[in-house]
């Protein structure tokens, strides 16, 4: 059965309040790639993907799980390298970013001095142009940034 909009907003607000009550803070790094216009017919720099990048950082309170149960790993097909789950709310993301759908390929999570890359994003109960929460599965960035 479809959830009414008022019940959906109730769930969304309840989840958001839980996030605000947590002691954890994470930083999201959103990487923007500036397109390089080749000056010649073929440019090795543009081809290889060595375009200049800029990063913007946003800090949020978040729920963070350091251990992932085997059942969750099986359900979502997560590799063993995935070592954490971050939960955020669209009520945090939309005011800061203007959207809540994150590009996993251009977003990194900074938590407790570690840089983590996103392996998978699940939008929890996506209804009415929003969702209750954003579940982000992360793994350590072995490339170092």
Question: Can you describe what each PLM-predicted range is?
Answer:
Residues 1-8, 24-145:
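Short, conserved turn/kink motifs that form compact alpha/beta structural patches or helix kinks used as
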Residues 12-16:
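Intrinsically disordered, non-coiled, low-complexity regulatory regions enriched in serine, threonine
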């Amino acid at each position: 059965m479809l959830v009414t909009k008022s019940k959906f907003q109730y769930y969304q607000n309840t989840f958001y309040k839980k996030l605000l009550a947590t002691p954890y803070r994470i930083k999201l790094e959103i990487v923007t790639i500036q397109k390089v216009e080749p000056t010649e017919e073929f440019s090795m720099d543009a081809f290889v993907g060595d375009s200049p990048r800029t990063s913007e950082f946003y800090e949020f309170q978040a729920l963070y799980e350091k251990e992932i149960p085997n059942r969750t790993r099986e359900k979502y097909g997560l590799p063993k390298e995935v070592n954490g789950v971050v939960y955020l709310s669209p009520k945090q993301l939309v005011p800061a970013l203007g959207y809540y759908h994150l590009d996993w390929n251009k977003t990194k999570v900074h938590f407790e001095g570690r840089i983590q890359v996103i392996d998978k994003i699940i939008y929890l109960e996506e209804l009415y142009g929003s969702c209750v929460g954003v579940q982000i599965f992360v793994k350590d960035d072995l490339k170092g940034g």
